[in-house]
UniProtKB/Swiss-Prot annotation:
Residues 1-21, 158-218, 246-271 are annotated as: Disordered. It comes from Mycoplasma pneumoniae (strain ATCC 29342 / M129 / Subtype 1) (Mycoplasmoides pneumoniae). Residues 170-199, 262-271 have a biased composition (Low complexity). InterPro entries: P1_N (IPR022116). Belongs to the adhesin P1 family. Residues 11-21, 205-216, 250-261 have a biased composition (Polar residues). This is Uncharacterized protein MPN_502. It holds the Pfam family P1_N.
Length: 422
């Protein structure tokens, strides 16, 4: 039958689409204004689109003869929970698809909430689908090109020639703290940017063997950025931008008794607990579907699995343990050893907002390890109330969705980010 060879599937919409190679077992989907899966046959002919937002199992589509052309819950031995599962995933966006190598009609689709894609578009400077163009006056005019990309008009930066640093510094012999203000051009108060206030303490210098005065050592005592990570704000055009007052030094408006000037930790948009409590709404989902283009019930939903972030942190990678000092004098790196990483994706210095309030307490006075102790561990970022243990990482949706993917079929098992779902 013809449907034995019709096993190509792509994703795309309008003029943007990606053809799926039937010889491969997975393909990357593209996201645009409307999100749908596009079905192709081996000859490269587009057969139809599967737009989850427009499919309703309660009102199946019928042709002119009254025959049901789409019945997602008929045939293929589906479970009785399929209607409820469909309502949980119909408003989510497909971002990746993998074809079962043992069954040309069985596909696994990775779905994420639509708000996650919108947030990613905002981070990249892309406009939302319903966002109109915005324009200002004079040199501040902006244009919105394809896919809402905002591009500023090219203009010469005349302020670079007279750019200078102005500020106030106070120093003392036993310790010092400085607060500086950077101003471009030195004329307008609106261009002033508050610098981070960093308190340091100096150690007395030591003399070398030849009697020379030793170098003065300065070590970090506290850092406002570690205690109050950067917030993200949005203007009328929904552009994510950094504000000068977003370092958490402003008085707390929650009425919890926070003193003026005390840093208020940045709160993630969604915490691990929120995603865990409502995975149908906030979590990523895996949809297993059957699609036979020339069958009467061509598409059917097999099962739906929601990816719980707590399950991810409990099962993959192997451990959140802090790395140990090995016999080579190097730190053993594991995928989940994020508390000490300064270059990796899970990085408390690069993304301090991924750590809950109270976890971003840097221990800068202790080196944390001893070369003579092979079992020594470094605390790095730790909780104030439980300083003898390493702090677990919080996994809000930025880190959660950024590390989900790589759908791979292994015999009858489906692997997503190393987690076996079946």
């Amino acid at each position: 039958m013809r449907d034995n060879i019709a096993k190509g599937i792509t994703a795309g919409s309008n003029t943007q689409q990606t053809t799926y190679d039937p010889t491969r077992t997975e393909a990357t989907l593209t996201t645009a204004t409307t999100f749908a899966l596009r079905r192709y046959d081996l000859a490269g002919r587009a057969l139809y689109d599967l737009d989850f937002s427009k499919l309703n199992p309660q009102t199946p589509t019928r042709d002119q003869t009254g025959q049901i052309t789409f019945n997602p819950f008929g045939g293929f031995g589906l479970s009785g929970a399929a209607p409820q599962q469909w309502n949980e995933v119909k408003d989510k966006v497909p971002v990746e698809v993998a074809q079962d190598p043992s069954n040309p009609y069985r596909f696994a689709v990775l779905l994420v909430p639509r708000s996650v894609v919108y947030y990613e578009q905002l981070q990249r400077g892309l406009a939302l689908p319903n966002q109109g163009s915005s324009s200002g006056s004079g040199q501040q005019n902006t244009t919105i090109g394809a896919y809402g990309l905002k591009v500023k008009n090219a203009e010469a930066d005349t302020a670079k020639s007279n750019e200078k640093l102005q500020g106030y510094e106070s120093k003392s012999s036993n310790g010092s703290s400085s607060t500086s203000t950077t101003q471009r051009g030195g004329s307008s108060n609106e261009n002033k940017v508050k610098a981070l206030q960093v308190a340091v303490k100096k150690k007395s210098g030591s003399q070398g063997n030849s009697g020379d005065q030793g170098t003065e050592q300065v070590e970090l005592e506290s850092n406002d950025l570690a205690n109050a990570p950067i917030k993200r704000g949005s203007n009328n055009n929904q552009q994510v931008q950094l504000k000068a007052d977003d370092f958490g030094t402003a008085p707390s408006s929650s009425g919890s008794g926070t003193q003026d000037g005390t840093p208020t930790p940045w709160t993630p948009w969604l915490t691990t607990e929120q995603i865990h409590n409502d995975p149908a709404k906030f979590a990523a989902s895996i949809l297993i579907l059957y699609d036979a283009p020339y069958a009467r019930n061509r598409t059917a939903i097999d099962r739906v699995d929601h990816l719980d972030p707590k399950v991810m942190t409990a099962n993959y990678p192997p451990s959140w343990r802090t790395p140990k000092w090995n016999h080579h004098g190097l730190w053993d790196w594991k995928a989940r050893d994020v508390l000490l990483q300064t270059t990796g994706f899970f990085n408390p210095r690069r993304h301090p907002e991924w750590f809950d309030g109270g976890q971003t307490v840097a221990d800068n006075e202790k080196t944390g390890f001893d070369v003579d102790n092979s079992e020594n561990t470094k605390q790095g970022f730790q909780k104030e109330a439980d300083s003898d243990k390493s702090a677990p990482i919080a996994l809000p949706f930025e880190a959660y969705f950024a590390n989900i993917g790589n759908l791979t079929w292994f015999e009858q098992a489906l692997l997503v980010f190393g987690i076996c779902l079946s």
